[in-house]
């Protein structure tokens, strides 16, 4: 219910060390005609008028910027508190909504001011006071948690994050800080339990320690990624130079609140010096990451890049020139999210914010080198807040779900949907009050047997295509799947099979409806009957339950043999395997022992058609490529000299001492006539 980023507490070290300079100097020489220094001069340089921020100023500015982003994107939903630590912990604000604003925090920080350098070095000045107060603040409930308790919520989750900005000497001091924080956390949870019951227990805490040092100073504290100290505490450590603390917190906040960065490019703005000309500027904004994931969908991704000087990715979108468009040109909105600029004080950001707050809207498009423009987002303001709207550039969210007929291989419109519905009704199972006897119940047996053979589309079956044209076929198929077929049913099926054989002998066509009023050739008619017999045999094989089924199967196989479509019985299980693997309309498979002239003619005809049409199989292409490559290389001499069936021996004289002592370049006469032996 309450996430970890619901509560965030900044603990700022207000000791004497934070009064020193950050060693980043800013030139104050604004006189015209004087060039700016090319490099930042060192401390004590006499070039121009310069100033430098203290470590305390860098820490306060960056932490306030952190909470500004949080309150802009999550107004009233996420809470940030500040605690200043020196000789004691000073609470800057509380969880109350009246203190969760920029004005209150800024005024309080002005009253704290920079630590004095005249403060004597003492152990009373420590950041530990602030960390203790931060743990106590995490145990205090927010207004939302109090409301959840009032409505009777038994378990209220209470997690939080503590960001401590301090400076430590080495890893040992940092380890001591972690141990003290973990100990105080356990003590605080012990206090809230019975019988004290003070506040909420802390389920988990994420401690982020930022070790701040001046520019150019090397720290003995090493960086460390997220590490689990205890089931209640995770700690990560970052050593940062004081001028870079804002960039580090900006990078951290994107992970803390699942944010994403978008850079709006090519924003036309009037120049201050020349109102008649304009230049293009870029503005970086932050928003929830879902603004990018929702707009893309599973089949589209936005291009990202790493902005110079930063370590996070940003999505680049172009400013789209406003133009008149109708409702049909607008994409549906799939989500809206609050937006805040990264650099709120820059002139381009200020111009964009004022432009939006004045009631204007901005369309953003995905930059493309070629093709049409794709508008993916829209910026607009309502009620003093700026939102980014995610526009659907994939399949519209308001469109109906994709039809079952829209397959990857093209539109398929001949699914046997009514037959599938009947199969589902026949296979429907309901729970029984008593457990049936035997290994398999009757319902489970039926459920396993019925869908063994079910063509999904009409273009892969001949048998089920003829049900409407042959009046006897539906009843015939019903008798085939009966488990209790009797002798009378067998006789009826035998009669229908013999009638079908007589029609094939006379050369009658099968009554297909899509013959386009043209009589098929005799060879095509035979192929249709042959496929019909094969599919019928496959159906009977999968439903053999009684002796009558077996007699019917043997009768059909004898008819297939008489018709020239013999099944090879020398291969065990070959017919049963084909019943599962072969499609009724698959190409004719010839058996090795078949002597049918019609089968041979079909095979020769298919070969002629393939050779005449120029079609080649994958094996032919691979073999041809291998032969062409092999012809360019000389074969191994030993293989050429070795008789067929034997293996050539590599280095036949290797290890022969008599041959090793021969003079180099002299070949004995007895070796000239010997060939390489295997």
Swiss-Prot record:
Low complexity bias: start-end ranges: 593-604
- Asked if the Swiss-Prot or TrEMBL record annotates the protein with the keyword Lipid biosynthesis, the reply is no
Q: Which InterPro entries match?
A: Cell_cycle_regulator_Mat89Bb
Q: Where in the cell is it found?
A: Nucleus; Cytoplasm; Cytoplasm, Perinuclear region
What Pfam families does the entry give? Mat89Bb (PF10221)
Where is this protein primarily located? Answer: nucleus
**Could you mention a single GO BP entry for this protein?**
snRNA 3'-end processing
State its role. Component of the integrator complex, a multiprotein complex that terminates RNA polymerase II (Pol II) transcription in the promoter-proximal region of genes. The integrator complex provides a quality checkpoint during transcription elongation by driving premature transcription termination of transcripts that are unfavorably configured for transcriptional elongation: the complex terminates transcription by (1) catalyzing dephosphorylation of the C-terminal domain (CTD) of Pol II subunit Polr2A/Rbp1 and Spt5, and (2) degrading the exiting nascent RNA transcript via endonuclease activity.
Know the name of this protein? Protein asunder
Supply the source organism for this entry.
Answer: Drosophila grimshawi (Hawaiian fruit fly)
Q: Which gene encodes it?
A: asun
